[in-house]
Amino acid sequence: ARCVASHALNIFGDHSDIYACRQTGFAMLCSSNVQEVMDLGTVAHLSTIEGRVPFIHFFDGFRTSHEIQKIETWDMEDVRDMVDFEKVEEFRKRALNPEHPVLRGTAQNPDIFFQAREACNPYYDAIPGIVEDYMNKVNEKIGTNYKLFNYYGAPDATHVIVAMGSVCDTIEETIDYLNEKEGTKLGLVKVRLYRPFRADKLVEAIPSTCEQISVLDRTKEPGSEGEPLYLDVVAALKGTQFHDVAIASGRYGLGSKDTTPAQIKAVYWNASWKDTYKPRFTIGIEDDVTNLSLETEGKLDSAPAGTTACKFWGLGADGTV
C-alpha cells in the first residue's frame, strides 16, 4: 500500500491507494508484518478461487514490503492440502477461451442496470465466511489465531484502538509496555478483512468493558467528517452495546511518516486529557496550523532489555528504497 500523489509526489507507504479502491468491488485483506504476508497471502488466493470475488491482499509499502525478516515459510504440500481443486477447475473454465466464447462488458440502460448491479450481493455476503474458513484451516496448519478482526491486549480494556497494517505491531508493543509498567487496561482491534466489512465480527472483537475507541487511519480525506475506517467503525457500532462509546478519529503515517510508541501512548492518553481531549487528531507531526496534533511526552522505549538497534542511512539506488 503506497501513497497517492496529492500536493506532492510521494512514493512511500500509506493507505490512500487502498481507500481509493473501495468502490472497485475487490475484497481487501490486510497483513501487518512479513509473517502475515506469507500466511494471509495463502488465505487470499484460496478465498478468491472459491468465492469468485477478486482480492487485494495489501501490506504497507516499504515498511513491510522491503523488510528483511526471519519467518516460518510454508511447505507447498500444506498449501496443496487446502486447495479445492474442483473450484480451481471451475475458475479455469471461466477464463476467456475462443472454444467456448462468452459476451462480457455489455452496455446496459436504466431499465436493467441497477438490478444487474445488485445481483452480485450473494457473492459478497459469502466472502467473510469463506475467508474465515480458510483462516481456520491456516490456524490448524501452523498454530496461528487469524480472525477477520483480531483482538490484542487486556481482556477488560477500557480504551481500544482500531487499526490495520504495520502500525499494529507498534501498538501491540506499546500495549504490552503500558499494561505491565503502568497498570493500564488497553487493547487493539486489528482489522484483517477490510472489505467486505463485517460489523458483527468487529463487535465480537471489542471487550464489553470498552469505554473509549480511537480509530487510526493512514490517509487523509479532505472535507470528510472522518476517514474511511473511522466511518466504517461508527456505522458498525450504531445500534450495538457500544453505541454510546466515545469514538475518536486519528490520522497517522502519511507518506511513511514514522509512528512511535510514544505517539501511540498519546492516543491512549488523549481520552484522559479532559480539558484538551481531541475527537479528531493527528500523530507524528506538530500541527501548528489547525492544532490537531497530539502532544507526546518524551521517548517511550518499549523494546525488550538487551535489544541492539541500528539505523541505516541511505536513499534510492543503494537498496534502502
For each feature predicted by the language model, list its residue ranges.
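Short acidic, glycine/serine/threonine-rich loops at helix termini
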Residues: 6-13, 39-43, 66-73, 77, ...
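Conserved thiamine diphosphate
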Residues: 10-61, 85, 239-255
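Conformationally flexible catalytic loops at phosphate/diphosphate-handling active centers
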Residues: 55-150
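Conserved phosphate/anionic-ligand binding catalytic regions in large, soluble enzymes, centered on
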Residues: 309-321
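Peripheral docking tails and interdomain loops at the edges
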Residues: 212-303
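Glycine-/acidic-rich phosphate or pyrophosphate-binding loops and their flanking alpha/beta elements
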Residues: 136-159, 293-307
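Redox- and metal-dependent alpha/beta enzyme cores, enriched for Fe-S-associated oxidoreductases
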Residues: 155-182, 197-204
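Terminal amphipathic helices with adjacent charged low-complexity linkers/tails
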Residues: 60-101, 204-242, 248
